[in-house]
Amino acid sequence: MTTDTRRRVKLYALNAERQWDDRGTGHVSSTYVERLKGISLLVRAESDGSLLLESKIQPDTAYQKQQDTLIVWSEGDNFDLALSFQEKAGCDEIWEKICQVQGKDPSVEITQDIVEESEDERFEDMSDTAPPIELPPCELSRLEDISETIQSCLSTPLRKEKLSMALESESYIKKLLNLFHVCEDLDNTEGLHHLFEIFKNIFLLNKNALFEIMFADDTIFDVVGCLEYDPSVSQPKKHRQYLKQLAKFREAVPIKNLDLLAKIHQTFRVQYIQDIILPTPSVFVEDNMLNTLSSFIFFNKVEIVTMIQDDERYLLDVFAVLTDPTTGDAKRRDTVLFLKEFCNYAQNLQPQGKDSFYKTLTCLGILQALELTLVMNDKKTKSASIDILTAIVEFSPLVVRNYTLNQANRPEVERMLLNIAIEQMLNDSEPELGIAVQLMGIVKILLEPENMLTEKGDFLNFFYKYSVQTLVAPVILNTIGDRPQNEDYQTAQLLGIVLDILSFCVEHHSYHIKNFLLQKDLLKRILVLMKSTHTFLVLGALRLLRKIIALKDEFYNRHIVKCNLFAPVVDAFIRNNGRYNLLESAILELFEFIKLEDIRTLCVYFVENFSKIFDEIEYVQTFKYLKNRYDQYQDRLKDRDKMENRTDGGLPIIRSGGRFRRDQRQMEEEEEMWFNEEDDFTEEIDTYNNVMKSVSEKNGPQTQNQQKSSPPHSTSPHSGLLGSLSTTASSTATSATSGAPVASGSSSPEAISADEQTQAAVHLAAAALQHHQQQQQQQQQNPFQQQTQPEIAELQQQLSSVEAPQSQELELSQSAAASASPTSSSSSLEASTSSSSASSSSSSSSSSSPPGSSAAASLCDSATVAAVAASQFLSTIATAMAASVTAAAATNSSPSISPAPAVSSPDIENADAQLPPSDDASSPASGEQDANSTEGTSSEADKTTAKKGLVDYESDSGEDDYEEDEYSEGPQAQKRARQA
């Protein structure tokens, strides 16, 4: 808390009208001012530092501290000032300084005694010892002196108390009333004017004991007579005539309790005095007049309610008359009016008393009685019945709900209390619709879910099953065609009330009102009212649609699109013809809400159907923004379609699968995830297409013809790719073995390297498949993984078809060399299905004569490209969201292939180029033993290469399990280990 904050104050000054004027905000300080010769309070303006206040702390000035943050004092006779502090600490600091100057204790609230307050403080001590007030003799000639004496006693509380005691003890009031009769008989106008002033001042004494005397049955009319002769009025009022003759007391059921009867009469007359005869309270606000009189009336009403509530016999008679079918309309009207006053008096009870009161009425059958009186044609009876129902519902809606639920099994649905109230609301014939508006308030309170407890679901089910049809009947009847059927003002007002209740239901009842609106197609009927000639009704229908859109419920949105419900709104906007009024602002706000909340369904629907109408509107940017947002949606969809449908020559194209939503409510979040996944997946697809294009260019038309002639294996989006891979790999392997004769002698290093890397790629794909199966068991499958399961199964089949032809060709080559190496041939046949044996056989079959070595190497390169592409795509599918793993595996396992730079590895290319030829290959005359030795060496190298490829994949997947293999010998294996 800083010093500036503590000392920040507002300065107030009291004006001539006794109102506080704000003189500015600033910071207060207490300092010695030489000019004033003392400690002064200085307030400087917060804005410019100008001096707002310079007030010397006077030793005899009364400073008062109020509410911990307010200091009030007077500068002179008629100039009051006040400082309102922002912080309590600052107020305490200034207050301590003031008390220090005046030598007072800072704990006091007032530094000096105030005259009026000092009299109050001394009143209790002086009340017994002070001399009584001597009133002049009660004579006709002394009326002026009596009036002046009473007027002079009103200045202090002590003198008021003494005067009250004198008036009460000496029966002075009755003596004055006797003089009133004398003056009235003599037509003594001056005396009557003095008596008016005397009794008006007696009311200002605010003493309940004097009220008891004046309001007694034998004196109250004389007091009213004295108050008729107001000097400011030329002719006296005739209050007594009204109370005695015009005011009629009607008893629907005779009251046998005389005390109760007297109390009712007294309360009515005193209420008349307060409301009609006495001046308005605003004139006497400073004297706090009429508070005791109001309390007198209040306690009278409480006593009346208690006495009636305790008289069970009387209440039974009242309700018997009310529910008796033979009771006349006049008597029933009087009974209802009596109950209305009874309920009005009960408003003065405490909450516990009110609860007991309404429970008593409910047990006696007040709600059953209201079912009869609400449908009466007499306006007074109906109005009083609605007032009673309003009082009950406002205090305890639970009572009415429980009663309504108990009526669910009643065969006469139309006679239910809630339906009766709705019918009376819709049938109100008054021009101002006072009854309809009052009943609308009752229905809203009953339908308010916040004040419902356990009966919420049951009552709403009851309402939407039995009552809502009655409520919306006028709307359905008036919207049969495409325009409102009845356009008179009375009907439009009633329809506006119905729309108000429906809007309330849309806002507070999510489930029930949604089902009702959608099943009955009611929203379309309501929007017919947008063509009404009454603007308030058009706004009511638009308000209902706006509340529905505010819910952002996709069920509502799809219903709006399906039924083209924006068309009436757009038509109303066009008919408004650009007039700047409430209707246009409301329509613009509706579309602005759609823009701000980014409601995609409605945005697309609006732009596709109505954007051309709003293209020329320049004074708001809402519609341009909606159009731009729509274009963004469309561009995104076009990119997705282009990705799915693109073609490149005769090569197969990978198609991304469709996106599946688990829940419509998660549309926006999953839409963004879908686009992110599509972007990553597209990169892998492009890489594959580039590789396949390079393979096609290198192999020429022969490979393409083989691809075209291969039958499809699946209807999967990826079946074209898999068939092409199988055909390319099979044909390449066959060409390699058939184009180069098998020899047991030396082999080409380039062919050996190509075969080794081809087999490593095949085993890399197998390892990727195994890794994917483990991931499926360890984690839940996301929607994208579930989508790619059929493609993964297809990959397994296609990889088997890639490996099988190669194994068959390799076995044939191995059998040709069986005479030279029976041991190697046997091992290759036994392990033809394993990755390591396939690698060994490939190495043996690759030994050929120098003339065919270049062709074999070229074809092996093509097979390697196809195998690498297969392994790359398989690892992409298997890891789904881990593209980095796929890229690393492809980089480590691919050989140097110039037609496919996206998957080549320069390091491996250099390593293969530097490999020295084996000793057996350089010998011109080698025997069977040398051939076997060469074959064994090649097999070991191939095993190492295959194992390295598998280990590299696992290492990239995050498992640090690479170790030096015992077979990893020789410069080639060591070089590959370092590269891994």
Curated annotation (Swiss-Prot):
Please state what is observed when this gene is inactivated. Mutant larvae exhibit hypersensitivity to the anticancer drug cisplatin.
The answer, when asked if Cytoplasm is one of the entry's keywords, is yes
Subcellular location(s): the record lists: Nucleus; Membrane; Cytoplasm
Instruction: Point to the regions of Acidic residues compositional bias.
Output: 953-968
Which keywords belong to this entry?
A: Cytoplasm, Membrane, Nucleus
Q: How does it associate, per the subunit comment?
A: Serine/threonine-protein phosphatase 4 (PP4) occurs in different assemblies of the catalytic and one or more regulatory subunits. Probably part of a PP4 PPP4C-PPP4R2-PPP4R3 complex containing Pp4-19C, PPP4R2r and flfl. Interacts with mira.
Function as written in the Swiss-Prot or TrEMBL entry: Regulatory subunit of serine/threonine-protein phosphatase 4. The probable PP4 complex Pp4-19C-PPP4R2r-flfl (PPP4C-PPP4R2-PPP4R3) is required to prevent caspase induced cell death (in vitro). May be involved in DNA damage repair. Key mediator specific for the localization of mira and associated cell fate determinants during both interphase and mitosis.
Annotated protein name in UniProt: Serine/threonine-protein phosphatase 4 regulatory subunit 3
- Which organism was this protein described from? Drosophila melanogaster (Fruit fly)
